[in-house]
Amino acid sequence: MALQTIAENAAIVPELWMHSMIDLVRATAIVDKALAQARTLGLPPLTVAVLDAGGCLVSFKREDGSSLLRPEIAQAKAWGALGMGIGSRAIAQRASVAPAFVSAVNALAGGRLIPVPGGVLIRMSDKSIIGAVGITGATSDQDEACAVAGIEAAGFTADTGADPAANKG
């Protein structure tokens, strides 16, 4: 009996794991759609990073002409959103009213938090977080718009942090 239960649970775990993290196929689709949106809008070269819910890099592209620090900036936007559980627009808003707090969190995070728009959480329909997108290269608002386009094209909900009540689960 106990062995059968263990075997049954082991078969379920991979299925649960796959639903709690963004997969490579969809992460790459997000990156590609975000870059396509940037080209449609005539934006400067972008760098796009998609992290899973654990903060690990899943998909990444840096367009020709992107500057040296763009990969780190894109990942920091996404990582900060994951670490705080809110889109980086909300982190920017907090930084404007509580700069000491955001500065302390950034120090705690080893400088891996960029408090400007462009770090967007990827949510499932049940509002669970499965990853985040970080984009840099244009204005922060344009970076964020491209992230939202990519996330929504992949069938997920984008959480920019603009409406903190919208994604409470």
Which positions does each model-derived feature cover?
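Flexible, solvent-exposed loop/hinge segments and secondary-structure transition points
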Residues: 2-169
